[in-house]
Amino acid sequence: MYSFRILENYSKDMFHSSIIRFDKASYLFNCGDGTQRNALDQGIKFIKIKSIFFNSSETDCYLGCYGFLMSRGEMNFSKAYAIIKNLENLIKTDSEEFYKNPKKKEEKNNEKNKSKDKSPNKKKEIKPILNKLGPDVINPFENLQQCTLFGPPNFSNNFKNSQFFCPVPINKYLYEYNSSTNSFVCKNIFKETKFPEPIKLYTDENITIIPICLNNNNIYSMSYICIPKQKNRSFNKNKALAFGLKPGPIFGELQKGKTVTLEDGKVISLKDVSDEPLPSSSVLILYLPTEEHMNSLISNEIMEKYIKKNLADEYIYNISIVVHIAPKFNIINNEKYIKFMALFGKDVEHIIECPEINQQFLYNEGKLKIQYLLNKVSRILYPDIIFSEQESQSPIKNKKEIFDDISKKNSINIDESIPGREYIIYPPDKKGFVIKGLYKGKAYYFNSEAHKTFEKNISDIKIKNIDVEIANFNQNVNNNYFPRVTFLGTTSMKPCKYRNVTSILIENKINNNKKYILFDCGEGTYQQIIEKFGFQVTENILLNIRLIAISHKHGDHMLGLIKILKEIDKLLISKKIILDEKSYIYVVVPSTIIDFVKNSIELDIITKNYFKVYDSNVFNVNEIQYYKKNLLQNNPNENFVDIEKLSPDSDYKNLTEKIQNFRKKPEMKIFYDDFMQKFGALFNTIEVFHCEESFGFFIENEVEKNSPNYWKISFSGDTRPNNNFFNYSMHSTLFIHEGTFDDEMTGDAEEKMHSTIGQAISIGKENMSKYITLTHFSPRYIKTYPFREEFEQKKILLANDYLTFNLYELSLAYKYLKPFDEIINSIEQNKKKKNIL
């Protein structure tokens, strides 16, 4: 199969992303924030993607490639790990059974088959097992397929300092275009000694991709001509029979390329009895950021040669699809460019990618179904899904009429870009557009036949709604305002079908104005905010965020940060907001990624002064640091935990006094006065036990601890159970802790520096926190974590994406878990319903 699919269209919030797919390999074009999850929703297999080609150095083009490369690397790692585990099991079996306890092995064999020879077992050699499994066992990562990146000039600047959080060696597989040599050159961004040869064009067994680099005032754009390898001629039995040839050895000779002479002397070759080879059916992806780039493309020498070849022999150089990407519609909607489009031929599909005409957002059916079920259990905790007017409208509302008019007058086929739409090019009998399970807006899905069928399938399931209990309780609580918490992502490692990676949004009010804090910002966090709140509320949230704190360097906690900063930057510019010297956001990150964040802001943020980046240790109450920083300089990816250093005194009174004294320091008092003005709470970091420079956080309001209006929210980040976080999170109103693993996987949790569900609950209970909420679950729990009676007995809340509550609602919020778990179990256990989610 050979196909072209649009993963994301070019809207005001996303750049175009698409993929060319063959049976055994794929080629990705652009990879923005959220592309990984959208690709996952569409069933794209990451491991097949050989290369990524970028149209631009804009952040929306490439921000998602870190997470994509790490996920893809993890899949490679899993392959290697499986080999290693297989080897370990073989060695373990042989060494334990034959070396340590040969009698036990003999007894086991006797039980299985008493008639077998009971002669003593001989020791087995381990070495032949290694030889049999092959060299990959010795170095299982050596031959794994890597993914190569190709971008415009200066593209490598975007990846400076990424080695401190991205374990994939990007430097070895990153090529940027060199205008002076007209070739892609591998960039030595981490000072490697060996350089691969420059690449004029990309070619492999499936495809040839020709780059076209355009420059105007140092704004570079890359366009790509993608030419698949032409299929060979195929032998046609009927044509051979028409010449009077009989089936048998003659057919075999012809298929080998030999000739056959007929009785009348006519010579028959393979060409005479074969179907014509299928045309190459090229795909062109053209990016035109300005009118000047458009003019340069039309007169470009490479493009002119290609079009001439296509006109000279359209059968061989056939063009199937041309994608036209432009930020403004008038760049491509003009007489000059439309004439250029007509040169490609009348059977070409022209896809217009422009924010002024495209739909704003894409929704996955499975994700909407889960939210629908959660909403049925509690509309208070999982409010009604917001239908934003913008999601089904484009700025240019009469685009269909415009497209029809252009098509009619110029005999060309023009269509809008729809995410999830795939154009099947080979085989010819399946040629055409297909789209499955994806909807241009929430309203499209909830009015669809698919949703009506889903409702019918679950109509016999009794769904208990807990809202009456919560509403009755809320009438009797303190009317003073308490913070509102929303979980934007609740899984670990990488985005999955029903959950995104970690992010928590905390809303507080100051003088009746809503202000926001973000704890962690995994890939796709911006997309999650839009899905939860709609476009208009999202704008208000972004303009009122006052603190973003990142717990540690791992991608599932920080890869969405730059996208959030960029969207805030775009809003400030578009709304012409004038900033004073006190108008800025605190961006608090560990030192391991501070240079990367500062470099990203310097490269692509215009309102730079609005973002003040601080090292997490600035707000670390505990003067004792658990990591040997002098060792980290030479080994940035290793853990060096100084276990000899003691945790602080666990006496709550002493800790409270210590925190207060820390905040009163002259150099810190400035910060804390500003915190109260900006978001009405005090903020501190706490070093925890995960990778180097890992932190938990806590925020609290500035009232007496025994006051009914006092509140405190603690967040563990990723961590093993440790006294440091235990002590500083004491007496939290809301204690948020990671629960990556089930209690049966204590060994895995210890090895990977995480906590189990049971460990997290014990910490929260023992340090006298009022309410416990768990998050950061393993991807194996993609829909729901299996319910345990303990959760109900201890009032433990486990978060799903978009869980939202005021602190005073926590006394009953845990009650949603059991009915939701019952719904999922009812669906999973019923074979007729098993595949409806």
Where are these regions (language model features)?
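P-loop NTP-binding site
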Residues: Y315, I321, E766-N767, F777
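An anion/phosphate-binding loop that grips the pyrophosphate of nucleotide cofactors and donors
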Residues: S732
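Histidine/lysine/aspartate-rich catalytic loop segments that bind and position anionic ligands
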Residues: H737-D742
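Charged helix-capping and loop-helix junction motifs
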Residues: E301-M303, E750-Q759
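A short acidic, helix-capping loop that chelates divalent metal ions and anchors anionic groups
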Residues: D743-D748
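Binuclear metal-dependent hydrolase catalytic cores
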Residues: M1-E314, S320, A326-F715, R720-N727, ...
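Conserved strand-turn element in the central/C-terminal portion of the radical SAM core barrel
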Residues: K770-K783
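A structural motif corresponding to the C-terminal end of an alpha-helix
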Residues: S762-I772
